[in-house]
């Protein structure tokens, strides 16, 4: 079925539009068309904060002043019908796939996975993330900060890496794939390579590093 929104993935292979022949002079190559975001396509920035209640910030009437978030909300959209699970990985999986956390096998955090289908923490291939949808429609995609969607047994230095952020639709990943890390000596990765940018720096702080990297990339 044709998708009127143009975001169906994966894109089906199209028949060759050119002509071929035994003689070079009789061949007509097809014009190569690269996937690209449509003209005027907006930039998309999603910010997910752990351990923050819906009514905490002034953005939604809460007591904690958040002028920067208020500016973002004023220039963007406010959604107030999203189900959270009160724990990080299931909520993140729902946000990125647009599906119930049990449907995408993330019924609990990756450290507590078991063999039941809703709890094995292995996101099914048919549940594309918003990053994968955007990437296959011409966007450059990046994740900065906490990943926490990779099964624990795939977190080793030899991979496999297809369920790391770079395998879930993100061209660029800078952050930590686990549940938590130190703000001063973090377990940090650039793509899938472990790095230690804090070495030799007494002023290093992870939050500032993540923000700087994200801004530079954008």
Residue map of PLM features:
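Formylglycine-dependent sulfatase
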Residues: 1-218
């Amino acid at each position: 079925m044709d998708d009127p929104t143009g975001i169906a993935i994966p894109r089906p292979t199209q028949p060759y539009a050119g002509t071929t022949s035994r003689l070079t002079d009789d061949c007509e190559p097809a014009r190569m068309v690269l996937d690209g975001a449509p003209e005027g396509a907006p930039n998309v920035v999603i910010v997910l904060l752990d351990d923050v209640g819906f009514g905490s910030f002034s953005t939604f009437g809460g007591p904690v002043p958040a002028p920067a978030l208020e500016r973002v909300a004023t220039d963007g959209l406010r959604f107030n019908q999203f189900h959270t699970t009160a724990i990080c990985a299931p909520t993140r999986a729902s946000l990125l796939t647009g599906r119930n956390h049990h449907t995408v096998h993330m019924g609990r955090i990756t450290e507590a996975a078991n063999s039941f289908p809703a709890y094995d923490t292995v996101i099914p291939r048919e549940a594309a993330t918003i990053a994968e949808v955007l990437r296959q429609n011409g966007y450059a995609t990046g994740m900065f900060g906490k990943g926490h969607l990779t099964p624990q047994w795939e977190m080793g230095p030899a991979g496999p890496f297809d369920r790391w952020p770079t395998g879930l639709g993100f061209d660029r990943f800078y952050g930590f794939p686990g549940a938590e890390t130190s703000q001063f000596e973090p377990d940090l990765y650039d793509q899938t390579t472990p790095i230690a940018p804090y070495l030799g720096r007494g002023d290093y702080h992870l939050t500032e590093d993540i923000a700087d990297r994200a801004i530079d990339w954008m």
